[in-house]
């Protein structure tokens, strides 16, 4: 006589967590950090079409690590939610905390009710409205719907520990854009070196996706930094004489 295969709820949750963590561990790393002008996003991403960083709404940005099709569905859903709420009420009613809570509820439901969890980790960031002085807000949302607000930076992807350790040592509040980019790139290199046996990889324009939420811009704060503008920032942060901030 055969017995039906039974898995306890605790074991099912453990297996789902392990599946999600393994998927995220294969992803390239993403860093989001607060700087003097807002929030900087830096991702290891050689693809120009499959983007990990995006605008969600006027003052809100999004970054993710994990399976692209899964976090892209979440990104598009977040944009639709924000547009609908901003149209029905007021644009200022759309906040980073609100969107982070929506993502947390969605991922929590998927984790507990669907056969397979999403293999994703998200960051939602918000800067103050133009003319206000409120500090940036950073929220981390994990595959099971857990949410945490981070005061300074968020690290996501496969090699978070060496990157987070590097940021803890080098992060400076109110850094310029050039300095913040240098801190983020150096931390990403520390993570890549940890997985490649100590060799320091080259992270340049072709292998980085960079964007900012610029609190000094009216209305739409999101801005991508690409091409020559990114190259100039990378050159500046490598130069000991660098004392200014480039724009792009």
Curated annotation (Swiss-Prot):
Keywords: Cytoplasm, Proteasome
Subcellular location: Cytoplasm
Gene Ontology cellular component list: cytoplasm; proteasome core complex, alpha-subunit complex
Any one GO BP annotation for this protein: modification-dependent protein catabolic process
Family matches, as InterPro entries: Ntn_hydrolases_N, Proteasome_alpha, Proteasome_alpha-type, Proteasome_asu_bac, Proteasome_sua/b
Presence of the UniProt keyword Cytoplasm in the record: yes
GO molecular function: threonine-type endopeptidase activity
Pathway linked to the protein: Protein degradation; proteasomal Pup-dependent pathway
Family: Belongs to the peptidase T1A family.
Subunit structure of this chain's protein: The 20S proteasome core is composed of 14 alpha and 14 beta subunits that assemble into four stacked heptameric rings, resulting in a barrel-shaped structure. The two inner rings, each composed of seven catalytic beta subunits, are sandwiched by two outer rings, each composed of seven alpha subunits. The catalytic chamber with the active sites is on the inside of the barrel. Has a gated structure, the ends of the cylinder being occluded by the N-termini of the alpha-subunits. Is capped by the proteasome-associated ATPase, ARC.
Function: Component of the proteasome core, a large protease complex with broad specificity involved in protein degradation.
Name of the protein this chain belongs to: Proteasome subunit alpha
Origin organism lineage: Bacteria, Bacillati, Actinomycetota, Actinomycetes, Mycobacteriales
């Amino acid at each position: 006589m055969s017995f039906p295969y039974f898995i306890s709820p605790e074991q099912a949750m453990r297996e789902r967590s392990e599946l999600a963590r393994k998927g995220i561990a294969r992803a390239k790393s993403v860093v989001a950090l607060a700087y003097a002008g807002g929030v900087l996003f830096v991702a290891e991403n050689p693809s120009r079409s499959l983007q990990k960083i995006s605008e969600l709404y006027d003052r809100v940005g999004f970054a993710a690590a994990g399976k692209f099709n899964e976090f892209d569905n979440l990104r598009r859903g977040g944009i639709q939610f924000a547009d609908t709420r901003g149209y029905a009420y007021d644009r200022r009613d759309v906040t980073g905390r609100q969107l982070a809570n929506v993502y947390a509820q969605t991922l929590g439901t998927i984790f507990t009710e669907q056969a397979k969890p999403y293999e994703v980790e998200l960051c939602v960031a918000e800067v103050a409205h133009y003319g206000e002085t409120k500090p940036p807000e950073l929220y981390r949302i994990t595959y099971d719907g857990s949410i945490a607000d981070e005061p300074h930076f968020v690290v996501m992807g496969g090699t978070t520990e060496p990157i987070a350790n590097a940021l803890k040592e080098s992060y400076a509040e109110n850094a310029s854009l050039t300095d913040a980019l240098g801190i983020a790139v150096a931390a990403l290199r520390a993570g890549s070196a940890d997985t490649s046996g100590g060799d320091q990889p080259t992270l340049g324009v072709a292998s980085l996706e960079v964007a900012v939420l610029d609190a000094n811009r009216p209305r739409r704060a999101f801005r991508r930094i690409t091409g020559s503008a990114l190259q100039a920032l990378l050159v500046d942060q490598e130069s000991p004489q660098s004392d200014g901030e480039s724009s792009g």
